[in-house]
Regions:
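A structural connector/turn signal
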Residues: 5-6, 74, 107, 156
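C-terminal accessory regions
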Residues: 107-110, 114-233
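Short gly/ser/thr-rich secondary-structure transition/capping motifs
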Residues: 1, 67-69, 180
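Conserved helicase motor core of SF1/SF2 NTP-dependent helicases
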Residues: 11-12, 80-83, 164, 203-205
Length: 233
């Protein structure tokens, strides 16, 4: 992170009204970015603050059901127009196109890759297809039978975020599997942010992760970054 506030919000949870305001209004304004450009990062998939649970909670808050928005349910997941989604496997055959401001295709190609993120632009029940607009401007049409290649991406694992950067990241600080609650995971999450890191939850969990060096030390600057976050001289 280059310049930004780092905020440990006491014992607040992601369902807290103030926390929701931070995610939907304060952070986007602070980093001059759309809320869809922010990213919640969590160590695990299966826990009270794992990816699956957080995506359900944040979808309900940031993109709730609306009579004007089409939906498609796949297994336990509801995909809704306006949802943030991620491609979860490499698919070299998926065709894409980029459009000009008049909606006319000006560039075409194929290949969508693991980790690509975008927003659901359209769900067409008649054609049984979902159109996703990816961050780089590509439009991709998925048949309903291909939706197992997508998942909601309001929250993703820290591992999945490696190699990516975001204007701001939100990191829930709650107890999880000890093997995942370590300094390396914390470092990876913190350094995904270009401007701002917001930590929500229990400050003691932050301390536990900072002190858990069970994995090989790989980052010489981590101590300095942790002190910066904690405002320690």
């Amino acid at each position: 992170a280059e310049d930004g506030i780092r905020d440990v919000l006491g014992s607040r949870g992601l369902g807290d009204v103030y926390t929701r305001q931070v995610i939907s209004e304060k952070l986007p304004k602070y980093v001059n970015a759309d809320v869809s450009e922010l990213q919640i990062l969590t160590p695990s998939r299966k826990s009270s603050v794992g990816v699956d649970r957080l995506n359900t909670v944040m979808q309900e808050y940031l993109n709730p059901p609306d009579s004007g928005k089409m939906e498609k349910k796949v297994g336990d997941t509801i995909f809704r127009e306006g949802d943030k989604v991620m491609q979860i496997k490499n698919d070299y055959q998926l065709e894409w196109e980029k459009k000009n401001r008049y909606g006319i295709a000006v560039e075409q190609g194929s290949g969508v890759f693991n980790g690509d993120t975008g927003i659901i632009d359209d769900i067409n029940n008649y054609n049984q297809s979902v159109t996703v607009k990816f961050e780089d401007g590509r439009y991709v049409d998925y048949e309903f039978t291909q939706l197992d290649e997508l998942e909601l991406a309001y929250a993703i694992t820290v591992h999945k975020a490696q190699g990516s950067e975001y204007p701001a990241v939100i990191i829930p600080m709650y107890q999880g599997p000890r093997m995942l609650m370590n300094r390396n995971i914390l470092y990876t999450a913190v350094t995904r942010a270009r401007k701002c890191v917001c930590m929500i939850g229990d400050e003691r969990i932050f301390n536990q992760m900072a002190e858990n060096v069970s994995e090989t030390r790989r980052y010489s600057s981590l101590d300095e970054r942790i002190k910066e976050i904690k405002n320690i001289e």
